[in-house]
Structure formats: structure tokens, C-alpha cells
Swiss-Prot record:
Main location: secreted
Subcellular location(s) per record: Secreted
Propeptide span(s): 24-33
Signal sequence region: 1-23
Source organism of this protein record: Pogonomyrmex rugosus
Keyword terms of this UniProt record: Amidation, Neurotoxin, Secreted, Signal, Toxin
Protein's name in the database: Myrmicitoxin(1)-Pr4b
A Gene Ontology term for the protein's cellular component: extracellular region
Length: 60
């Protein structure tokens, strides 16, 4: 069950939060043409920390 919740949390981050942070004009789940490599270069460490925090909250 926790794994499912974690998966949804990660998908939410990827589909909604990242496009908004990266300034994608059509931010949201439908903005599929995002260049993830560019985003990871810009905010890789922050994103990894955010995902780690989410995982810790779910497991802890």
C-alpha cells in the first residue's frame, strides 16, 4: 500500500510540480513534451532531496 502511495507522489511531482517549476508554458499533466534531462541538470539535487523527503515521510 505504501509503495502505491509513493508511486502516486512521485508521479504527481513529475507530472505537475516539475513543469510549473521549470516554467513550462502549458504546465500540468498534459505537458508531456518536457525535456527531463534539462530539468535534471537545473534542479537534480533539489528534486532528489524532495523525493527522498517524500519517501521518508511515507516509510517513517
Amino acid at each position: 500500500m505504501k509503495a502505491i502511495i509513493f508511486l502516486f507522489a512521485v508521479l504527481t511531482v513529475v507530472a505537475i510540480i516539475i513543469p510549473i517549476i521549470s516554467g513550462e508554458p502549458n504546465a500540468g499533466p498534459h505537458a508531456a513534451s518536457i525535456d527531463l534531462n534539462e530539468i535534471m541538470k537545473k534542479m537534480g539535487p533539489d528534486l532528489l532531496k524532495m523525493l527522498d523527503d517524500i519517501k521518508t515521510k511515507i516509510q517513517g
